[in-house]
Amino acid sequence: MDILFYHPTFDISEWAALLQRHLPHARLRAWQPGDNAAADYALVWHPPYDMLRGRVDLKAIFALGAGVDSLLSRLNEYPDLLPSGVPLYRMEDTGMAAQMQEYAISQVLHWFRRFDDYAALQREARWEPLEEYRHADFQVGVLGAGVLGGQVAQSLSRMGFPVRCWSRSCKALPGVESFAGPDELSAFLHGTRVLINLLPNTPETVGIINAQLLAALNDNAYVLNLARGVHLVEEDLLAALDRGKVKGAMLDVFQQEPLPHESPLWRHPRVRITPHVAAVTRPEEAVAFIAQSITRIERGDIPPNQVDVARGY
């Protein structure tokens, strides 16, 4: 079994060694320009145009990340980038859900326990106990109710926060109030104190966190963007922060990455930044998922996490 591999930064030797443990008869081959030899599967991240074009012999393509927007967005320019009829799969929960829960929970608690406010008091050498927030007044709204969004929402619900989610279609999540579709977005936003974004990147969700949406949040709201930078209109967030509508923001993703040095987000006192590290692909978990998926395909089954190219996720 031959498996093509392309990632601009991952070390193929580590992936090859891990794959041997799960699929001893598989051979991982680093794709190089001009490599047109046959292969059974492909593992890719930001693949060059010539890598996959015309490879209709592939049984499946695995994108080495939870999102596939960077791949699908190129189809408008290169319609033949992906070979016709070959299923595409994504890494949906290869350790990413646990990482995302850790990140989201830590930040919600940071705001809930008013650590930003206490840090400001410390800079002024002021000893001043503040009125504590109540869980009932700290409504959390999660945009996106897939595997990542759903698990984040349920984790926060178990901690006593009132939690709601909004997605394309209604989802039944224990302890979470569900909203769906454009007609229910306003109701979802009403009263939301903490907005967590875990939406997929599709044409419908680009720029969704804009001035109109931010204005519909509760006063002194908080914004946590963990999905994609294109979801957020950064200028609108800065304006909402300066007006006091939004009290604080934690951003892991940006319209342009790396975030340019001149971006005002770097220097805003109520914005915290991390460099797209909320949930990363861990080789051990990713290889185990890929091996299980390949085993299922070889048996004639369809693994989970197949991408609907038309929907974009």
UniProtKB/Swiss-Prot annotation:
Pfam family, one: 2-Hacid_dh_C
EC category name: oxidoreductase
Active site: R228, H276
The keyword Disulfide bond belongs to this UniProt entry's keyword annotation: no
Reaction(s) this enzyme catalyzes, per UniProt: glycolate + NADP(+) = glyoxylate + NADPH + H(+); (R)-glycerate + NAD(+) = 3-hydroxypyruvate + NADH + H(+); (R)-glycerate + NADP(+) = 3-hydroxypyruvate + NADPH + H(+)
Keywords from the UniProt entry: Cytoplasm, NAD, NADP, Oxidoreductase
UniProt EC number: 1.1.1.79, 1.1.1.81
Keyword Membrane listed: no
InterPro entries according to UniProt: D-isomer_DH_CS (IPR029753), D-isomer_DH_NAD-bd (IPR006140), GhrA_Enterobacterales (IPR023514), NAD(P)-bd_dom_sf (IPR036291)
Coiled-coil residues: none
SUPFAM superfamilies noted in UniProt: NAD(P)-binding Rossmann-fold domains (SSF51735)
A GO MF term: hydroxypyruvate reductase (NADPH) activity
GO-annotated cellular components: cytoplasm
Location within or outside the cell: Cytoplasm
Family statement: Belongs to the D-isomer specific 2-hydroxyacid dehydrogenase family. GhrA subfamily.
Function: Catalyzes the NADPH-dependent reduction of glyoxylate and hydroxypyruvate into glycolate and glycerate, respectively.
Protein name: Glyoxylate/hydroxypyruvate reductase A
Organism annotation: Cronobacter sakazakii (strain ATCC BAA-894)
Gene name in the database record: ghrA
